[in-house]
Amino acid sequence: MVNDSLYSKELVCPACKSKIEVTKVKSKACVISSKDTDFCVYYEGINPILYEAWVCEYCGYAALGERFEELTDKQAQKIKTGISPYWKSRSFNGERNIDLALEAYKLALYNLHVLEAKSSDLAKVCIRIAWLYRINDKDSGSKDKENEFLNYALQHYVKAYESERFPIGKFDEITCTYIIGELYRRIGNPEESLKWFSKI
């Protein structure tokens, strides 16, 4: 691996049982420079968010690294029937640019839809896709795409707030209420934003 901030991890894909490698960022290479109000983090050097979506090159299974190995046999069967038959083998290992990271995240999002995942899981991937478009501000169409995925994330966070038990991932009720208010603010709906912020 060319970039010494990266390293490879070997594991077994929980969907197809193939031995695969995924790329991770060394923790010492992650130096935070700033944070946005919706928890988007900026780094001085390499950005670990580019590597958080892992992909099996053999079957097309993709998920956030923290959840990648949490796949039941029933879910694995859904991957085999809903994704693998249409998958063209390709590797996402090694150094990634934003375009490749976006592709990995969108594949993870598609996997979640096939698995009929919880709203909170969908929200987590959607907001990260929005952040990647924000980081990629050199692309003239990125702002529209950012807002599109912020809106998707918002819809899923609201559904999660209404239907899931707290904590939702790492979010307690106050944090979830805050992120909903903040996302409403970012997409230009101050009335709804204030309504949610007033609950805190």
Language-model features and meaning:
Residues M1-T81:
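N-terminal cysteine/histidine-rich coordination modules
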Residues N136, S140-K143, N147, I187:
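Structural motif corresponding to the intra-repeat A-B loop/turn of tetratricopeptide repeats
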Residues L154, V158, P190-I200:
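TPR/TPR-like (Sel1-like) alpha-helical repeat modules
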